[in-house]
Amino acid sequence: MKRGFYVGRFQPYHNGHQAVLSELARTCDEIILGVGSAQLSHTLENPFTAGERVLMITRALTDLRCPYYVIPIEDVQRNALWAAHVRSMTPPFDTCYSSNPLVVRLFFEAGVDVQSPAMYERDRHSGTEIRRRMLAGEPWENLVPPAVVTVVREIDGVERLREIARAD
């Protein structure tokens, strides 16, 4: 059985993440999604709580034809220990999938097989761009799965982001 690990902040979960997971579902028997920086919320870079991100992901993946786990992963303040921390919080996995250079390096140094999936229209499908559009009042809904739009509206996420921006 091949179990893959895919980590991201998912602030918010978007169509680029969805495309990667659809691809991983073809090659993995199970997928572990690590919700990174789980302790962070209510900031411009991390407006959503770990629980809200878990909700976005689980609602968006209802049609994924692969069993998956969604596990919040808090940061540790020593990068050299991070891969071991992740392994202690997740089921065992064979491969880490990431395009983040630090994540790739840390898991490589920990002796884990690391593969970098292709990025899906990275210029548009990034949390930074989606949050920028939310703040600017520009359309963002087409960049995330419909289930994520619903969650963001349920939690009044755009207004939260705008209030945080005013406070800074």
UniProtKB/Swiss-Prot annotation:
Signal peptide: none
Pathway: Cofactor biosynthesis; NAD(+) biosynthesis; NAD(+) from nicotinamide D-ribonucleotide: step 1/1
Cellular component, GO annotation: cytoplasm
EC number, UniProt record: 2.7.7.1
Keyword annotations: ATP-binding, Cytoplasm, NAD, Nucleotide-binding, Nucleotidyltransferase, Pyridine nucleotide biosynthesis, Transferase
Residue pairs linked by disulfide bridges in the UniProt entry: none
InterPro entries linked to this entry: Cyt_trans-like (IPR004821), NMN_Atrans_arc (IPR006418), Rossmann-like_a/b/a_fold (IPR014729)
Catalytic activity: beta-nicotinamide D-ribonucleotide + ATP + H(+) = diphosphate + NAD(+)
Pfam families: CTP_transf_like (PF01467)
Family matches, as NCBIfam families: arch_NMN_Atrans, cyt_tran_rel, PRK01153.1
Family matches, as PANTHER family: BIFUNCTIONAL NMN ADENYLYLTRANSFERASE_NUDIX HYDROLASE, PHOSPHOPANTETHEINE ADENYLYLTRANSFERASE
Protein name: Nicotinamide-nucleotide adenylyltransferase
